[in-house]
Amino acid sequence: MVLTLVVMGVIIVLAVAPTGMCSFEPGRPENGPVREVDAGTFLHMEAASLGVPVRDPGVPEGWTSNSARRSTAGGEEAAVTGYITADEGYLQLTQTGASERDAAATEGREKTGEREVAGATVSVYAADSDEVRDVWAIDLGETRALISGAAPESDWETLT
């Protein structure tokens, strides 16, 4: 039985290797080029169709918008854009008309405090689990902006 498995493994390797569809590179993976999307155009189109104001955060030089999609947050439609920061961190900005609590208090998150950033009050939502990322929520009147991701706190403040 073991011999049969070895023979099958050799046959599979011999059949797949010439296709060039497989590769093995031991060591740490390297980041490839970031595919850029036009977040400004996406947000402009979303502002026209969501029924709530959507803002373009105007990210600093060195940041790249790499994703834009429509999703839901708190049961309402939402515009979601993702950004690779200059330090290769990642932040996601979700804009929705849902209430702050409905949009941010998901996956076991609870409001853990507030802070002032650039003149805005930011509500911080966190969960007990390390697998659930924190969310910063900013009430912009008719719209709530939610920031989540993996980047230094200074980048979170920049996106606010």
Which residue stretches match the model-derived regions?
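A short, solvent-exposed beta-edge/loop patch
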Residues: 16, 113-160
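Residues that form generic nucleotide/phosphate-binding pockets
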Residues: 17, 42-46, 159
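Ser/Thr/Pro/Gly-rich low-complexity linker/stalk segments immediately outside membranes or between
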Residues: 21-36
